[in-house]
C-alpha cells in the first residue's frame, strides 16, 4: 500500500493507494500552524489509522509547499510554519518505524501525471503548472529529477527571453518576483501574469476568467491580449523544451483549463525550437486536486 500526504497551509490530506494505484481511502484534517509536536502526532495518527484500515504497513510519502534540504534533512516550507526548519523526515520515520520520503508538491504533481496508465509510456515527462506562479517537475523513467538543491522544477524563475521582449516591448517592466529577482517568467505567463499583462497594456484590471470570456465573445482587446500571451508562452516554453527535450508535457494549474493553450502551442512552438526538434505531446493534467496526494504516495514507486 502507498500512503500519500499532501501537507498544505490549512489542511493535511492523506490518500491510500493499492497495488493497482487506485485510491481506496482518504482523510483530511486541519494543519497545525505553529505546533511541530502536534503536526508529528497528527501524521503518526493518520498513518496508524491507515495501517489499521489496510491491515498492513504502507509506504509513506509527503508533498510539501516548499523544499527539503538534502544537506541537513530539514524542510523549508513557509506556508506551514510548524514544519519550517524542522527535520520532519527523520522525526516522522522514527515515530512510525519506516522510511518517509518528502518532496516538493509540484514534483508530486508531475509524478502523479507521469504514472498515469497512458502517460507511463513516455520516458520523459515535464509537468508544468500555470497557476498563481509557474513551476512543475521533470520525471525521467518514473522518477523525479530533483537536482542538487531540489529546484529542478522552479521553471518560473527563468528570466524573460529576448524573443519575449520583442513581443512585449523592450520597455516592459521587469516585475519584481518573490524570489528576489526581477523579470522572472512566472510574473508574465502564470495566471497572475495573464491578468497583469492585460492590465499593463489596457490600464484595466480583470480576472482571468473574465478576460477569457471576453476573448470567447470576440472582444478585440481580449483577442489581442490572448494572441500576445500565447506568443510569449510559446517563447518561454520553447526555451524550456530545448533545454529538457521531454516526450510529454502535462499542464496543470488554473490556466490549464483554458483550452486555447492546447490548440495554439503546437502551432507557435516550432518557431522557437531547433529545426530538428519534434514537438512533444502536450496534454491537460488528468488528476486535478488529487494530484498532490497521488504523487506523494508514488514517491516510493520508482524503486519497483
UniProtKB/Swiss-Prot annotation:
Q: What is this protein called?
A: N-acetyl-D-glucosamine kinase
Gene encoding it?
nagK
Against Gene3D superfamilies, the record matches this protein to: 3.30.420.40
* NCBIfam families documented for this protein: PRK13310.1 (NF009835), PRK13311.1 (NF009836)
- Binding-site positions, Zn(2+): 157, 177, 179, 184
GTP-binding found in the keyword field: no
What keywords are annotated for this sequence in UniProt?
A: ATP-binding, Carbohydrate metabolism, Kinase, Metal-binding, Nucleotide-binding, Transferase, Zinc
Q: Pfam families of this UniProt entry?
A: ROK
Query: Which family does the entry's similarity section mention?
Result: Belongs to the ROK (NagC/XylR) family. NagK subfamily.
Q: In which pathway does it act?
A: Cell wall biogenesis; peptidoglycan recycling
Native organism is Yersinia pseudotuberculosis serotype IB (strain PB1/+)
Q: What is the lineage of its organism?
A: Bacteria, Pseudomonadati, Pseudomonadota, Gammaproteobacteria, Enterobacterales
Protein purpose? Catalyzes the phosphorylation of N-acetyl-D-glucosamine (GlcNAc) derived from cell-wall degradation, yielding GlcNAc-6-P.
Catalyzed reaction equations: N-acetyl-D-glucosamine + ATP = N-acetyl-D-glucosamine 6-phosphate + ADP + H(+)
A GO molecular function annotation here is: ATP binding
Q: What is its EC number?
A: 2.7.1.59
The organism's superkingdom is given as Bacteria
Q: Hydrolase: present as a keyword of the record?
A: no
Biological processes annotated in GO: N-acetylglucosamine metabolic process; peptidoglycan turnover
EC top class, as a word = transferase
> Which amino acid positions bind ATP, per UniProt?
4-11, 133-140
Amino acid at each position: 500500500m502507498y500512503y500519500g500526504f499532501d501537507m498544505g497551509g490549512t489542511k493535511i490530506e492523506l490518500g491510500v493507494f493499492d497495488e493497482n494505484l487506485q485510491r481506496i481511502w482518504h482523510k483530511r484534517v486541519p494543519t497545525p500552524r505553529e505546533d511541530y509536536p502536534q503536526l508529528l502526532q497528527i501524521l503518526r495518527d493518520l498513518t496508524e489509522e491507515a495501517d489499521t484500515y489496510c491491515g498492513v504497513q504502507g509506504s509513506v510519502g509527503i508533498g510539501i509547499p516548499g523544499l527539503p534540504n538534502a544537506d541537513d534533512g530539514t524542510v523549508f516550507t513557509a506556508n506551514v510554519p510548524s514544519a519550517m526548519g524542522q527535520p520532519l523526515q527523520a522525526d516522522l520515520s522514527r515515530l512510525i518505524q519506516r522510511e518517509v520520503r518528502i518532496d516538493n508538491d509540484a514534483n508530486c504533481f508531475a509524478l502523479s501525471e507521469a504514472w498515469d496508465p497512458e502517460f507511463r509510456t513516455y520516458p520523459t515527462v515535464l509537468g508544468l503548472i500555470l497557476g498563481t506562479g509557474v513551476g512543475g517537475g521533470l520525471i525521467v523513467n518514473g522518477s523525479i529529477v530533483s537536482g542538487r538543491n531540489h529546484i529542478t522544477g522552479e521553471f518560473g524563475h527563468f528570466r524573460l527571453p529576448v524573443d519575449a521582449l520583442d513581443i512585449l516591448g523592450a520597455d516592459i517592466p521587469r516585475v519584481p518576483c518573490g524570489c528576489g529577482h526581477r523579470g522572472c517568467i512566472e510574473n508574465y505567463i502564470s495566471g497572475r501574469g495573464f491578468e497583469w499583462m492585460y492590465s499593463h497594456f489596457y490600464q484595466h484590471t480583470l480576472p482571468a476568467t473574465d478576460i477569457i470570456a471576453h476573448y470567447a465573445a470576440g472582444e478585440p482587446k481580449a483577442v489581442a491580449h490572448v494572441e500576445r500571451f500565447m506568443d510569449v508562452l510559446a517563447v518561454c516554453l520553447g526555451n524550456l523544451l530545448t533545454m529538457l527535450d521531454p516526450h510529454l508535457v502535462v499542464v496543470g494549474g488554473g490556466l490549464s483549463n483554458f483550452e486555447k493553450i492546447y490548440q495554439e502551442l503546437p502551432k507557435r512552438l516550432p518557431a522557437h525550437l531547433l529545426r530538428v526538434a519534434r514537438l512533444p505531446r502536450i496534454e491537460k493534467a488528468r488528476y486535478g486536486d488529487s494530484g498532490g496526494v497521488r504523487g506523494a504516495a508514488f514517491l516510493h514507486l520508482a524503486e519497483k
